From Swiss-Prot:
Any one of the GO BP annotations: phenylalanyl-tRNA aminoacylation
Naturally occurring in which organism (per UniProt): Bordetella pertussis (strain Tohama I / ATCC BAA-589 / NCTC 13251)
Record has Ribonucleoprotein as a keyword: no
Protein name per its UniProtKB record: Phenylalanine--tRNA ligase alpha subunit
Lineage: Bacteria, Pseudomonadati, Pseudomonadota, Betaproteobacteria, Burkholderiales
Cofactor note: Binds 2 magnesium ions per tetramer.
GO function term, MF aspect, one: magnesium ion binding
Length: 348
């Protein structure tokens, strides 16, 4: 850049402002604008070169041109900031245009959750039994072999102990006993009975696990088991308690209940409990609903009690089974497929 004097420098400064305005206006994005800025305001920019050339002028001209160059710098910076703002606004407008909301589209409903039908049954069962004086037990889902089988009078060669029916865990407890996923909620009753003195009146609802899966069985399912032990409990008490429970749960006073002789290692005598509706889609059909019986003397001993003094009854029902009958569901697997269309109907 060559200068003849202050007049030529003044013309050059004015021309630089015009050039900067054109260059900035031509910049289509932030990167191009920064490149244009460097051409005028950078370390090697045109204004920097002019400032270095002031040394060739006399003091009066240096003062005059210095002021003019600083004024030009302010003008160029103002043009730069204005273009930056314009580019930023254009970018924002483009983004907003691409994110335009079509207000004519139907709105989305609130994604409010609901209580699972099996949990509804769980809560209802607890409420009914609490109302007649039963406590509610809790316990671990990973159990030892003794509490799950031996304490309940299951012999070592019982089929339920096989790996085809039980999920075993490759670990042992502190006493060296094999661990497994509990196959029923009876272990909670064992633990409760060994920690409490008679009379013992408790239900044990919870998750259980067995190697089984079809329309009416699941590898994980829910059970509720009941236990009442005292000095004067009879089979008649079992019939009265469970019949009243079913009639309350299904809200049907005309529901018919029968007890069929059966066998379970932990009760003697044992009975399957069937029920029959006298109205509705299941009218006239006998439906198996529970297993029950008088607690076996050996099980009473394993509770730490004297079977000559204490007697009691026990029962066990599948919560999924109760839920299926209450709501008319035919396939247990529907409860766990996560189909909101199916689950939502229980919360309407």
């Amino acid at each position: 850049m060559r200068f003849e004097g202050s007049n030529s420098m003044t013309l050059l400064v004015d021309d630089l402002v015009s050039q900067a305005q054109e260059r900035f206006a031509a910049a289509s994005d932030a990167a191009a604008l920064e490149n244009a800025k460097a051409r005028f305001l950078g370390k090697e920019g045109a204004l920097t070169v002019l400032l270095k050339a002031l040394g060739k002028l006399d003091p009066e001209q240096k003062r005059e041109m210095g002021a003019r160059i600083n004024q030009a710098k302010q003008q160029i910076e103002a043009l730069l900031n204005a273009r930056r703002a314009a580019l930023a606004q254009a970018e924002l407008d483009a983004r907003l245009a691409s994110e335009t909301i079509d207000v004519t589209l139907p709105g989305r409903g609130k994604a409010a959750g609901g209580i699972h039908p099996v949990i509804r049954t769980w809560e209802r069962v607890e409420e009914i039994f609490r109302s007649i004086g039963f406590d509610v037990a809790d316990g671990p889902e990973v159990e030892n072999d003794w509490t799950n089988f031996t304490a309940l009078n299951n012999p070592l060669d019982h089929p339920a102990r096989s790996m085809q029916d039980t999920f075993y865990v490759d670990m042992h407890d502190a006493d060296g006993l094999p661990l497994l996923l509990r196959t029923h909620t009876s272990p909670m009753q064992v633990r409760y009975a060994r920690m409490h003195k008679p009379p013992i009146k408790v239900i044990a609802p919870g998750r259980t696990y067995r190697v089984d899966s079809d329309a009416t069985h699941s590898p994980m399912f829910h059970q509720v088991e009941g236990l009442w032990i005292a000095e004067d409990i009879s089979f008649a008490d079992l019939k009265g308690v469970y019949t009243d429970f079913l009639r309350c749960f299904f809200e049907s006073d005309d529901l018919v209940v029968r007890f069929r002789p059966s066998f379970f290692p932990f009760t003697e005598p044992s009975a399957e409990i069937d029920m029959m509706f006298t109205s509705g889609p299941n009218r006239g059909r006998w439906l198996e609903i529970s297993g029950s019986g008088q607690v076996h003397p050996q099980v009473v001993r394993n509770f730490g009690l004297d079977p000559e003094r204490y007697i009691g009854f026990a029962f066990g029902s599948g919560l999924e089974r109760l839920t299926m009958l209450r709501y008319g569901v035919n396939d247990l697997r529907q409860f766990y497929e996560g189909d909101l269309r199916f689950l939502r109907q229980f919360n309407e």
